[in-house]
Amino acid sequence: MKTIIFVCHGSICRSPAAAFMARKYLKELGREDEFKILIRATSSEEIGNDVYPPMRRELIRRGIPLYPHAAQRIRQIDYDNADYIFYMDYENKYSLMRQIDDYKSILFPINKWTNSITEIEDPWYTGRYQLVCDEIEECLKDIFAKM
């Protein structure tokens, strides 16, 4: 079983959306037993908080099953046990590079195999939850097509 960690700044919008969408997509593909999906933050600002309400509403609107969630900051032990860590934007990447030893081998942008998307913007600032979920969905399809 491969361990994938989705990471964003606070772990209340993008990374939980990616994880919940990935779980649904993998179940549809019959591949849910191949992957352990985790959610982490690069900051400690939102530790313990659930998914941000506007993102929660967008996931519900899309029929994405929600799971219990309390934001956690990524730790070295998470990295040590991960096969892939997918970050949403370059701010996340630089935060991870400062926090994690030997980050290079498993740290990837979520859009690694998606040419049409440069970064996943933070909807907490932009309010564009639908667009963010559309982009995450496209990235996830490309990720799991390659794995």
Residues covered by each model-derived region:
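Phosphate-binding/catalytic loops
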Residues: Y84, Y90-M147
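Conserved active-site segments centered on acidic
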Residues: M1-N81, A145
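Helix N-cap/beta->alpha junction signal
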Residues: S15, D89-Y90
